[in-house]
Amino acid sequence: MQLTGHLLIGQSAIAGQNGTLHAIAAATGEPLDPAFGGASLHDLDTACALADDAFDTYRDTSLEARAAFLDAIGRHIMALGDELIERCVIETGLPRARIEGERGRTVGQLALFASLVRDGGFLDARIDPARPERKPLPRVDLRLRNIAVGPVAVFGASNFPLAFSVAGGDTASALAAGCPVIVKAHSAHPGTSALVGRAIQQAARECGMPAGVFSLLFDASREIGQALVADPRIKAVGFTGSRRGGVALMHIAAARPEPIPVYAEMSSINPVLLLPAALDARHDAIAPQFVASLTLGAGQFCTNPGLVLAVDGPALRAFEEAAAAAVRAAPAQTMLTPHIHASYEQGVAALRDHAAVELLAQGAEGNRLQARAALLATSAEAFITHPELRDEVFGPASLIVRCPDADTLHRVLKSLEGQLTIAAHLADGDAPLFAALRPLLERKAGRILVNGFGTGVEVGHAMVHGGPFPATSDTRTTSVGARAIERFLRPVSYQDLPDALLPEAIRSGNPLNVPQRIDGVPAPREANHV
């Protein structure tokens, strides 16, 4: 499939005229062909008009048709074959095996939402039958279902060019909910974005979906992204990226005459707690596992373990020595973009030069675009006193906080902002301490894990990839897993409508055979007769 640099607006490919951008080869810093034309405000208006026109038609497609569309997107992504993998490797500097794994995750995510749509449980169908005999007043007939909120704007992420980008979790869950999607592609991988966008476009055409169900825009500046969030036809936003970028979009959305939600996944340092019994027994085993997680993908994971908390003593110092040795042996790695690399170097330098911080180790040197892993340490009092030590450094750097006792460790945890993950390493003797800490961990993070690291995010029904601000903008939500669909739904209640005028999901007899609750009680999936 030849890359043209065109915008994808509905079923059309249009040459953008508002400036140009080139992908940059991550390993060399050289620009890549073709040039991608930036969208104009007119292009944005066209995409939003198409999405608005498509909304009612698309949200009323049958569950099977919508699920088949999601499955078709996955098939067309797989059909891109090596072309997609090779372009993605060049643009991002990520290894081929990582990209192949991420492609599988992306397609699997689409399949999960297709299964969710076919089941129909996301509709949350509820029926409170009329009770005309109730005294002193009769009860009306009330029925409820979820509907799609409207067209959704999605901002692709830099660090997951497939799974959090054009056909990533935000797009998949919004399409599953019945929302048309307009994606603002990330400038770090426009070629990858264009290939995946064409796959979605082809799937939409194959499945007979309305033209405006999907559009892909490139932006040579920030103008189009900001205008997209401000457009009154957009009803929700999905974003994965920096705290600064997410907060800027939140402000734009809140300032609209009709404010809308921005579901932004932003900043997290993902503390790792090394509890005393585990640290005594397994420090030599935990250290290399920690460094492997820290350096995975050049540390460019939103769940990267950027903070280690432990009670100081011989076991912690032994852990530090083992981890420092592993860091020194870690090869330098290419980062996603020169800008990300420069930001990482600045973040490490700020920590290294801080009077209260000790540099324990750095990884092997590489070229000018490659990142060296870094391990640093500080005291608990310094960490609590200096809020700048709690800033995220995006990349393979982690700060160890030495706590004099468990009470101080608790104080350090209390000083933290919201997190995506908190990992605790514990042995049998640590159970009482963990039990005492768990209420605080629940207040601070969206996912709590034991004897592991947060860098693996399973796509499933029980996953939460979210957390209190600034991990995300809305602590009630997740951007990964089945519950991600809930961000793009809203409930509608129907009172005393004749059965023939009700949506099928909440009709008597349950013609769609979807899960229903009658008077709050799950009803049998076979047709019922209310």
Swiss-Prot record:
Catalytic center residues: E265 (proton acceptor), C302 (nucleophile)
Keyword set, alphabetical order: NAD, NADP, Oxidoreductase
Reaction equations catalysed: 2,5-dioxopentanoate + NADP(+) + H2O = 2-oxoglutarate + NADPH + 2 H(+); 2,5-dioxopentanoate + NAD(+) + H2O = 2-oxoglutarate + NADH + 2 H(+)
Top EC group: oxidoreductase
Pfam families attached to this UniProt entry: Aldedh (PF00171)
Entry binding sites for NAD(+): K184, G241, S242, R243, R244, G245, G246, E392
Pathway note: Amino-acid degradation
Induction: Induced by hydroxy-L-proline.
SUPFAM superfamilies reported in the protein's UniProt record: ALDH-like
Keyword rRNA-binding set for record: no
Annotated GO MF terms: 2,5-dioxovalerate dehydrogenase (NADP+) activity
EC number(s) given by UniProt: 1.2.1.26
Superkingdom in the source lineage: Bacteria
General function of this protein: Catalyzes the NAD(P)(+)-dependent oxidation of alpha-ketoglutaric semialdehyde (alphaKGSA) to alpha-ketoglutarate. Involved in hydroxy-L-proline metabolism. Prefers NADP(+) to NAD(+) as a cosubstrate.
SUBUNIT field: Homodimer.
Protein name as catalogued: Alpha-ketoglutaric semialdehyde dehydrogenase 3
Source organism per UniProt: Azospirillum brasilense
